[in-house]
């Protein structure tokens, strides 16, 4: 019934804007309707969409937005489009990240965290709806110099972990702003966080298995921070000795071109151009 309702609304439209894949669009899109995929992430560390085995092929998109030229090829594969249909506009959400500041509000809510060194742990989810979701965690009590704030993917639910502070109900961008560093893995949050010019660590103990089973769209040699495969490496890496900010700048330029606060304007201009064509 939900598919039928969607189809009725789609048929009434000239343009459909998506931020996730859509079964109805991939199977029943009317020929006179244009589809713009803005996606819900700023990039894709792991392969996704048509790059991996899935229940149905992603198709019928007319345009896809991305953050840099680098993403044209992986996005064309994932969304079943030609590279010339992938448009480099930047994501509106980046304007939000760079232009707002909610530190004061956060520390009013959590006064016990003020003046503490805060490390945000924000991993991706593993698994799927059929087989169940999993999480790659570590012993937060081993981290001595930071308070670990953890926020997991919404699909994982409100999981509790000992030794850290549960931030699953807080806004991710607020947590990025208040934290001093990030630990993540195959999550696209590394692209957003890189623009804040703060240190990052990649904790990927299962990288060989992950490359084999899922596949990656980026080379972790590009990652600007320590890449750790066990907990001891991770704890040591949190000392952040000689962090390579030049490499961080290269990472930003390669994967996240626009930081001028005008991504939203470019996306609106793109939508207006599409509407003139329909």
Describe the predicted segments one by one:
Residues 59-64, 147, 178-181, 222-225:
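Short active-site oxyanion
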Residues 260-278:
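C-terminal alpha-helical cap of glycosyltransferases
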Residues 161-162, 188-256:
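Catalytic binding pocket for nucleotide-activated donors in carbohydrate/polymer assembly enzymes
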Residues 16-37, 168-213:
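A donor-sugar binding/catalytic signature common to diverse glycosyltransferases
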């Amino acid at each position: 019934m939900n598919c039928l309702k969607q189809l009725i609304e789609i048929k009434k439209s000239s343009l459909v804007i998506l931020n996730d894949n859509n079964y109805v669009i991939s199977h029943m899109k009317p020929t006179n309707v244009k589809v713009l995929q803005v996606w819900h992430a700023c990039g894709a560390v792991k392969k996704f969409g048509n790059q991996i085995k899935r229940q149905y092929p992603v198709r019928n998109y007319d345009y896809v937005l991305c953050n840099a030229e680098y993403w044209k090829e992986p996005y064309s594969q994932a969304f079943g489009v030609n590279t010339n249909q992938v448009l480099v506009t930047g994501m509106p959400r980046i304007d939000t990240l760079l232009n707002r500041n909610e530190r004061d509000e956060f520390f009013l809510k959590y006064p016990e965290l003020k003046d503490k060194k805060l490390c945000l742990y924000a991993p991706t989810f593993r698994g799927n709806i059929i087989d169940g979701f999993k999480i790659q965690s570590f012993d937060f009590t081993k981290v001595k110099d930071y308070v670990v704030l953890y926020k997991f993917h919404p699909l994982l639910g409100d999981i509790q972990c000992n030794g850290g502070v549960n931030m699953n109900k807080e806004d991710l961008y607020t947590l990025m702003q208040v934290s001093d560093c990030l630990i993540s893995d195959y999550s696209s949050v590394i692209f957003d966080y890189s623009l804040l010019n703060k240190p990052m660590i990649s904790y990927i103990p299962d990288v060989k298995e992950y490359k084999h089973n899922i596949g990656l769209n980026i080379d972790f040699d590009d990652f600007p921070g320590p890449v750790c495969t066990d907990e001891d490496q991770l704890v040591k890496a949190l000392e952040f000795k000689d962090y390579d900010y030049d490499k961080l700048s290269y990472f930003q330029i390669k994967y996240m071109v626009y930081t001028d606060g005008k991504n939203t304007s470019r996306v609106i201009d793109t939508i207006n151009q599409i509407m003139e064509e329909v």
